[in-house]
Amino acid sequence: MTYKVLHIGAGGFGERWCDTFLPQNVADGTIEVVGLVDIDAKALDIGRKHLGLKAEQCFTAAAQAFQMVDADFCTIVIPPALHEGIVDLALARGMHILSEKPIADTMEASVRIAEKVRKSGLNMGVTMSHRFDQDKSTLRALVGADAIGRVNTVSCRFAGDFRLYDSWGRFRHEMMHPMLIEGAVHHLDIMADLAGAPCTSIYARTWKPEWADYKGDTDAIVLMDFANGAHGVYEGSSAQATGLNDWAFEYVRVEGESGTAILDHREIEVFHRYPMRLRQASRQGKGQQVSLLPGRKWQNALLIEQFCQWLDSGPPMATNVWENLQSVALVFSAIESVRLGQPVKVQEFLQSYRVGASIE
């Protein structure tokens, strides 16, 4: 079945959806884009051309689009603070929802959205694109196949040069916690996935160097404990001097009982322990190289396909809104840890919001 889609957000990263992710799924008949919304007329026109839409299929007001467009689901690619209003419009029209991360800009709103969707009986997925990129998927398959034994630690480094104003999208430069909400939301999610268990405790420190043109903190160090005994260390910066590990070129290392797997700049290598040796030493670049998994679609293009398979009565996608609350909880419990200056118990933090969720 080909599903009809109303897409919300053509500017910024929304343009990537319009010129790459959506067209890949239009080309193979997975979806048909039947409407487009953006408050910026210029971005709207660029998106319209990418998608081959008619002028009457494009709108600057979301409410009007939801009234006039007949679609099976909507895709949301706008700032997190605006997500809930679009979710409400979609649910009122009986549309399923596929949204960019995070679910919302607060823990309370994220849980509220998940509850609204659950009560509606409709489906909502969240596009954790980096977990489903080709390199991270290969690393996940490697670790999941027990190539390095039981996981002990997961380390991740993101270092991007977005220090100048508007280099990372204007709204991020105006946020209080841009690194955690817009950056670490992906990386902590990947780390929990590789650890193979929910995060139980998180301790975070954030700051902003004087050369970073942001209102909020651009740098973060995060320590994580997982339910299976694994541990995690995260280092993130959007104000690094040279873009050493920019988007899609992160450094990730998984230490296991019998080996080490390293992902660096989209290249993966594995080091194995030789049990007959008393001790051994290794060096990055000298390990066993691992080829990336083959595939036609990755990142959000793949997640759109998975969402449609879910609508076709397949199993819920891994990043369905209810499961994705775990990823959101990582971010907002980290923010709470920054506020308190001490570790936060993640599952208790999440449960406190679930209990207190208020749906009118």
From Swiss-Prot:
Matches recorded under Gene3D superfamilies: Dihydrodipicolinate Reductase, domain 2, NAD(P)-binding Rossmann-like Domain
Ligand binding (NAD(+)): 4-22
Domain of life: Bacteria
Any one GO molecular function term: nucleotide binding
Residue ranges that the Swiss-Prot or TrEMBL entry lists as coiled coil: none
Signal sequence interval, chain numbering: none
InterPro entries xref list: Gfo/Idh/MocA-like_OxRdtase_C, Gfo/Idh/MocA-like_OxRdtase_N, Gfo/Idh/MocA_Oxidoreductases, NAD(P)-bd_dom_sf
Key words, A-Z: NAD, Oxidoreductase, Plasmid
Cross-referenced Pfam families: GFO_IDH_MocA, GFO_IDH_MocA_C
Purpose: Could be a NAD-dependent oxidoreductase.
Name the record gives this protein: Uncharacterized protein y4oX
Species annotation: Sinorhizobium fredii (strain NBRC 101917 / NGR234)
